[in-house]
A protein has these predicted regions:
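Short, positively charged and aromatic/hydrophobic N-terminal segments
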Residues: 23, 32-34, 42, 50-51
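Active-site-adjacent loop and "lid" segments of alpha/beta metabolic enzymes
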Residues: 61-63, 86-100, 119-150, 155-159, ...
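N-terminal binding-site loop/beta-alpha segment at the start of enzyme catalytic domains
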Residues: 67, 73-95
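Catalytic domains of carbohydrate-active enzymes, especially glycoside hydrolases
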Residues: 99-115
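Phosphate/pyrophosphate-binding loops at sites that engage ATP/ADP/AMP, CoA/4′-phosphopantetheine
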Residues: 106, 227-240
Length: 347
């Protein structure tokens, strides 16, 4: 007999069945009360970090900050590479890259993300740090002087990150979330720059061959948690961190859609961190928009699908969207933000 039951049996004059029922009833009430308390605490935590437009918080970046939550921010993609999946070679020259950066600024970009190495699935191999630096630093240097918006450097290499920060970048966007080079965190912390940690699996050369994981939400949240802890251990302040679930990086089409659909779960787990989502022109959009013969839509015919997917992501809690088509994205999120603001402040 359990020692916990003896006092109940003595109280009831030695009638075990009745005492046992009383014991079960008391335990059930305790469980219900405890569950209610936990749920109230969870709701309170979520209410402390909502993502609807009329509540804001600050993302600290180098020499400044960006307001998160007031409206959705748009990050324009500027690839200075010969082989990116969507626009490789278009802006490889310094003059064309600068012109494109200015064009995105005029179209309403809040941030411009400069990348010097293609991360498309199946990419042949990494670019050396020296070559990548040579590609991005002149562009960052020129645009930081010409534009009044922050620049981000899209790199997984600490050497490139440091050089770009010295040239004027305020944010580091690491698609490996420190898996390839954890010294990226050191370079970011020392400069007080913003740090975007994106979930990915494998490398650009192998990610498309990896077997799918059973639970993609668990995989993403667990991996990002580990990267966040590593960044903080190396001196990165939490208020400088943004997370990205990594749509299209080592995921199946179904998993990409699942991540977008369940983005609010990521918000629940990381309520204080801004979320960036990049679906722009990704291959899963091309496959969904395939023609009758099954041929995927090419990158230049994926804009409308990209806008639909980013709209869904914003409605689920994305704070920043990373896009090729800046004007279309700016207009799309403006409408979404208006709808959400209206729903929070009905007439």
């Amino acid at each position: 007999m359990s020692e916990k039951l003896i006092p109940f049996f003595l109280e009831c004059g030695g009638l075990p069945p009745l005492c046992y029922l009383r014991y079960l009833a008391i335990q059930s009430v305790r469980v219900i009360v405890t569950t209610a308390v936990i749920k109230r605490r969870q709701v309170a935590a979520l209410q402390s970090f909502p993502y609807h437009p009329n509540m804001t918080r600050t993302w600290k970046i180098r020499d400044g900050a960006l307001t998160i939550g007031e409206r959705t921010l748009v990050m324009g993609i500027l690839n200075v590479t010969p082989d990116s999946f969507s626009d490789g070679g278009q802006f490889f020259s310094l003059e064309k890259a600068i012109d494109q950066g200015k064009r995105m600024f005029d179209e309403g970009a809040d941030i411009i993300d400069v990348g010097g190495e293609s991360t498309r699935p199946g990419n042949a191999g990494p670019v050396s740090a020296a070559e990548e630096t040579e590609r991005v630093v002149p562009v960052v240097e020129a645009l930081s002087k010409a534009l009044a918006i922050p620049l981000s450097i899209d790199t997984t290499k600490s050497e490139v990150a440091k050089a770009a920060i010295d040239a004027g970048a305020a944010i580091v966007n690491d698609v490996s979330a420190l898996r390839f080079d954890f010294y990226v965190a050191d370079a970011t912390a020392q400069a007080g720059a913003g740090l975007i940690l994106m979930h990915s699996r494998g490398t650009p050369a192998t990610m498309h061959r990896l077997p799918p994981v059973a639970d993609i939400m668990h995989e993403v949240t667990t991996s990002l948690s580990a990267s966040i802890k590593m960044a903080e251990r190396r001196g990165v302040k939490r208020e400088t961190i943004v997370i990205d679930p990594g749509i299209g990086f080592g995921k199946s089409q179904e998993q990409n859609l699942e991540l977008i659909e369940n983005l609010d779960q990521l918000r629940t787990i990381f309520p204080d961190l801004p979320i960036l989502v990049g679906t722009s022109r990704k291959s899963f959009i091309g496959r969904i928009l395939a023609d009758e013969a099954g041929n995927p839509a090419p990158p230049d015919r994926r804009m409308y699908g990209s806008m639909a997917s980013l709209a869904a992501a914003v409605m689920k809690g994305a704070n920043i969207v990373r896009v090729h088509d800046v004007r279309a994205a700016v207009e799309t999120v403006r409408i979404i933000d208006a709808i959400r603001t209206n729903s929070q402040n009905p007439a």
